Amino acid sequence: MGVHGLLPIIRKVASEGIRWLQPEFFSKYYPVLAVDGNLLLYRFFRSPNTPLHTNYQHVLWALKLSRYCRKLKTSPIVVFDNLKPNDFKAEEHEKRSLISSQIVNQRQVVQEQMYFLCNLKNCLIDNNFPTGNFYYEIGPLLSQIGKLLFDLRSLNERDNPFHAQNNAENLENATFVRLIVDKLNDREKTLMIQEKKNHLIHSLRQLLAFSEINDFPSEIRSYLEFILSNLDLECLTLCLKIIKGILTLDELQKAIKLKQTELDKLERRLYRPSPQNIFEIFEILKILGIPASFSPIGVEAEAFASAISQNNLAYAVATQDTDVLLLGSSMISNFLDLNDNFHLPLQIMDPRKIAQELNLTFDGFQDYCLMCGTDFTSRIPKIGPVRALKLIRYYGNAFDVLKALNVEEKYIIPTDYIKKFLTAKKLFTDLPSNNELFSFIHNIPKEFLHLSDSTYLDLEKQVLRIFNVQIEELDAKTPWYYHYELEKDVKSTYEY
C-alpha cells in the first residue's frame, strides 16, 4: 500500500512539503475533503481500541467520522474501493492473500499454545504432578536441554554489527560489502542453529519417552509433543520450569495474558469489513447527509478521491496511502486519528511542494515514486529510494534511467518491468473525469454542516435505533465531541 520508502525520504529531504494545521483553523483551508473510506475503516477495525467479534464496529466508525467532521467544520465525501477486485493489482492481491494465509497459520499455532498453557494452569492449580526420585534421573537431561535452549536463543538474538549502518547516505554505498559479509555470517549461523536444533530434538524425544514411562500428567506430555513438533523455545522454557517445579501461577498467568495479546493482534490483522458492512455505512451516511460512493471498476478509492479533488469538488484527500501524492493531490495523513486528543494538529502533505524540495519536476516525482515501488510496480533489484532519487535527479526521468541501467551489468531489470511501469504511469495520470461519476456529490454544506445540532442529533438517534447501538459506545469513541448548541441538555436528547 502506497509508495514504498517515500515517507522517510520526505521527512529527511523534503520536510518543507509537510505542514501542520491546528483543528480550529482546518475548515478555513479545507472546507470539503475527499475521504479514502477503505483505509480509514480498515484502520479503525484493526485498532486495539475497537472491540473484537461485534457486529457494529462499522456503525461506530461512520458516526465517529461524522462527528469528527462536524467538530472540524469540514464536509466529507466518502469513497470506497469497488467491490470488484482491480485486475491491475492481481499480483498484489496474491501477495496479500499469501500474507493472510500465513497469519491464519500463525494464529492457529498461538491458539494451540493458549490451549496448552491453560491446561498447564489447571495442572498447576490442582498440583497434579508426580513428585519422586525421577527428578534426579532426568536432571542431566534437563540441564542439557536448558543449555541448548540458551544457545539457540543467543544465536537468534545475535545482532550483526553491519546492520548498524542505517544512515540514508551510506546505506546503499555499504550494501555490496554488507551483503557479502551477511551471507557468510548467515551461512555459518544457519549451520550452527540447525546442529543445535537436531540435538534439541533428540533430547526432547528422550524427555518425552521418560514422561510416558513415568506417568507424567497428560497435559505435560501433550505440551511436550506440541513443543517437539513446533520447536517453540518460549513454550519449552515454561515446560522445563513446570517439570522442575519452579513455575509459579503468577508467571504462568502472565504468559497466558501475553499470549492472549498476541492472539488479539493476529485476529485484528485478519479483521476486515464485509460488503454488507460497507452497504450499511452507505445507508448511515445517507441518513446523515454525507455523500458516499464506490470507485469506478478498475479505479482505486484513493485515485477516485484524488479525481474528486482535482475536479475542484474537494480541497484534499484524507488518507494514509501515499499513492495520493503520486496522483497529485494534497494528503491529510492523520485524519480521524485514533487517539483521544482532538487538539493535535493535522498533517498536510503537498505533492508539488515535495517535488520541488526534492529538486524534481512533478513528472519526475511520479517516475521516482514508481521506481520506489507501489502496488502496481516493483523495485529494480539493488535500487532503493535513495539511489532512485539520485538517478532521477541526474537523468530527469525513468526511461533515461532505464537506458543507463541497461548498460551497467550490476543492475538486472526484470523483463516485464517497463510494461508494468507504463501501465502504472497511465493509471496514476489518467484519472476519472466523467461528470456522471461525480453526480452523487451535491449541496454538501446544506446537507451536513448547515444542519442544526438538534437536527443532527435526531438523525444520529435514528441511526443508533436502526442498528441497535448504545450511545455510550459512541461517546466512548468520541470523548472530544461536544454538542455545542445543546450542552447541558444533551443527555435528555438521547433518551429513547
Swiss-Prot record:
Domain of life: Eukaryota
Cellular component terms per the entry's GO annotation: cytoplasm; nucleus
Residues that, per the record, bind Mg(2+) 1: 36, 81, 300, 302
KW Hydrolase (keyword) present: yes
GO biological process: double-strand break repair via homologous recombination
Keyword field: Endonuclease, Hydrolase, Magnesium, Metal-binding, Nuclease
GO molecular function: 5'-3' DNA exonuclease activity; 5'-3' exonuclease activity; 5'-flap endonuclease activity; DNA binding; metal ion binding
Entries under InterPro entries matching the protein: 5-3_exonuclease_C_sf, HhH2, PIN-like_dom_sf, XPG-I_dom, XPG/Rad2, XPG_DNA_repair_N
Sequence positions that bind Mg(2+) 2: 321, 323, 375
Cofactors that this protein relies on: Mg(2+)
Chaperone as UniProt keyword: no
Cofactor info, note text: Binds 2 magnesium ions per subunit. They probably participate in the reaction catalyzed by the enzyme. May bind an additional third magnesium ion after substrate binding.
Family according to the record: Belongs to the XPG/RAD2 endonuclease family. FEN1 subfamily.
Protein name, per record: Uncharacterized protein C12G12.16c
